[in-house]
């Protein structure tokens, strides 16, 4: 599933800014669901990270063909946090985004995203993951985001 030539960025997936606790984030529940959905995946507690103490969970998801997606789930406040797809192509990050949308978020319209590329450019608006559609549809939205930021 890995595309070596694809542009890689770090994507951040989260609940809507105006309803940050909408996912009711729980690292143990997240880890258990991820491990069940992706055989061979790993989820390891990292403890507190960053300037504001934040519980964290390091994740690795097998994508096939020897490719892996690395990620980090951080929870700086109870029930509130984000999920990072680290240095990923749009297609790779879409696998994680779809799982969050379809199996973790309580409603498919509660998954928003940004990227390190956007934040580096001062962009503060979050995009929304489509509330329906397959992994390819999500990958297209993420790739459009990268393309817009690269212009």
Annotate the PLM regions.
Residues 8-11, 81-83, 111:
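Hydrophobic beta-strand segments of well-ordered beta-sheets in folded domains
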Residues 75-90, 141-151:
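Extended, charge-rich low-complexity interaction segments
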Residues 1-42, 150-151:
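Short, extreme N-terminal segment that most often corresponds to the first beta-strand
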